[in-house]
Amino acid sequence: MQQTLIIGAFDGLHKGHQLLAQAASGPVVALLIANIPSLQSDWLYEPKQRQVQLQQHFQSVVHSYDVIEHNISAQAFFDQIISPLRCQQLVVGADFCFGKDNQNADFLRRLFPNTTIIPKDSQTLSSSTIRQWLKQGQIEQANAVLLEPYFREGVVIRGNQQARFLGWPTANITLKPYMVPLRCGSYVITVTYHQTNYPGVGFISYKNDQLVCETHLIGFSGDLYGKQLRFTFNQFIRPQQKFSGVQALQKAISGDLKQAQKWFAQSTN
């Protein structure tokens, strides 16, 4: 049976990536470009997360390639990486570039004539656009084009207990510096723990120059320190702001909780 190879970083699978899979004439094999020298930060997802998404959404066999460790010419990349996969069709986007000599999709088609190039005007979406939306807090715009709502994963760490003192204990994770920096402020968040989803309100801010997400799980009681959780971002509520005192802060948090409860009530209807 014919197999089709799709190639890309696939950083945040979106509807534009679907065009690659839809152009396939057979079962899809994905060559995941794990790292890119020109993109040292602002990643949407870790390589392992991108691999899992490809497997789940495209039912793909996934091969991973690290450009930073093996930065070779386009010809060598074709000979050593693409050819051994023995696929009968290649599908790439019009802006696809490969090799340390930065060759383009037309060069790839000269090497492999059965290469389908998805026109750029058909790829109205891009990971770069999604990154900008997330930096601006435009979560709902990003989620509308992503194949699954945007999430982060992390191990819960101990915070300064301030939220617990105020009556809203939180599960805190640090957001890795090489990932796209999300806008500081409050969010409606779904927390996944042991395959169970909990509604929550999260707050992103800088603590000692490190971006941290502090999330209150509505209706949850228990010890989550050291546990691996998934935080799915559903809606941006408000930007970070300074408060005149504890009462003003508590009032704002209460408003955040009401907005989150409203969002979850509407999402289940």
UniProtKB/Swiss-Prot annotation:
GO molecular function: ATP binding; FMN adenylyltransferase activity; riboflavin kinase activity
CDD domains (alphabetical): FAD_synthetase_N
Any Pfam family: Flavokinase
One of the protein's GO biological processes: riboflavin biosynthetic process
EC number, as in UniProt: 2.7.1.26, 2.7.7.2
Keyword Lipid metabolism attached: no
Gene3D superfamilies reported in the protein's UniProt record: HUPs, Riboflavin kinase-like
Domain of life: Bacteria
Alphabetized InterPro entries for the sequence: FAD_synthase, Riboflavin_kinase, Riboflavin_kinase_bac, Riboflavin_kinase_bac/euk, Riboflavin_kinase_dom_sf, Rossmann-like_a/b/a_fold
Recorded catalytic activity of this chain's protein: riboflavin + ATP = FMN + ADP + H(+); FMN + ATP + H(+) = FAD + diphosphate
Pathway(s) where this gene product acts: Cofactor biosynthesis; FAD biosynthesis; FAD from FMN: step 1/1; Cofactor biosynthesis; FMN biosynthesis; FMN from riboflavin (ATP route): step 1/1
Uppermost EC category: transferase
Keywords in alphabetical order: ATP-binding, FAD, Flavoprotein, FMN, Kinase, Multifunctional enzyme, Nucleotide-binding, Nucleotidyltransferase, Transferase
PANTHER family linked: RIBOFLAVIN KINASE, RIBOFLAVIN KINASE/FMN ADENYLYLTRANSFERASE
Function in brief: Catalyzes the phosphorylation of riboflavin to FMN followed by the adenylation of FMN to FAD.
NCBIfam families attached to this UniProt entry: ribF (TIGR00083)
Family: Belongs to the RibF family.
Protein name: Bifunctional riboflavin kinase/FMN adenylyltransferase
